[in-house]
């Protein structure tokens, strides 16, 4: 497991102190209230310690942080909507789930996803990750969380297949993980680990593992 910190961050020392822990990294599914709480903590940390200065907003680092903040806002909105729908007696629709990656007590990455069979993509194998992001000061967490999600798909009987609707700036990163663009699409991508030679393999425990380079 390879996790590192970007040394070019504004306040790297603050986050490194939070993340350096003897506790084993944990990835687990969160209930809506806990997911909302953890997102708020992550957003507060980013706003207080990581937001770029006005002259940095257009560089790669600034765009990464701003994109992460916008994704968090979007996911928070989804959670609020789901909570309202669940309070309705006539609730029906896609059930989103939230899987988070923790180092010690700090959440460093999250995936918002749903099972395709229970959505408008019911005729498509796999699970769909609607949003996935990591703390802007951490590198390597996203691919580790994706590995976990591939095995989640496998355990659900979906052969490890993952679907995403990729942001343009994220397409290359998804390709490095083995995703391929769907036919007739410019953003919808699918990962089939069994067809991603040189990127994925199954270990002795029949778990999918990503071949990091």
Where are these regions (language model features)?
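Glycine-rich phosphate-binding loop
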Residues: 138-144
């Amino acid at each position: 497991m390879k996790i590192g910190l970007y040394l070019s961050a504004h306040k790297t020392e603050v986050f490194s102190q939070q993340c350096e822990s003897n506790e084993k990294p944990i990835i687990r599914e969160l209930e809506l209230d806990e997911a909302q709480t953890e997102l708020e903590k992550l957003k507060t940390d980013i706003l207080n310690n990581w937001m770029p200065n006005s002259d940095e907003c257009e560089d790669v680092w600034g765009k990464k942080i701003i994109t992460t903040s916008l994704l968090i806002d979007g996911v928070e909105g989804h959670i609020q909507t789901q909570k309202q729908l669940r309070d309705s007696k006539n609730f029906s629709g896609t059930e989103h789930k939230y899987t988070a990656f923790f180092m010690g007590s700090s959440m460093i990455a999250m995936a918002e996803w749903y099972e395709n069979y229970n959505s408008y993509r019911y005729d498509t194998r796999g699970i769909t990750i609607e949003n996935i992001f990591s703390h802007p000061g951490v590198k390597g967490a996203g691919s580790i969380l994706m590995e976990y999600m591939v095995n989640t798909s496998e355990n659900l009987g979906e052969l490890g297949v993952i679907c995403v609707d990729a942001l343009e700036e994220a397409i290359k990163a998804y390709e490095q993980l083995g995703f391929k663009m769907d036919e007739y699409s410019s953003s919808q991508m699918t990962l089939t680990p069994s067809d991603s030679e040189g990127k994925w393999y199954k270990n002795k425990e029949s778990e999918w593992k990503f071949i990091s380079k």
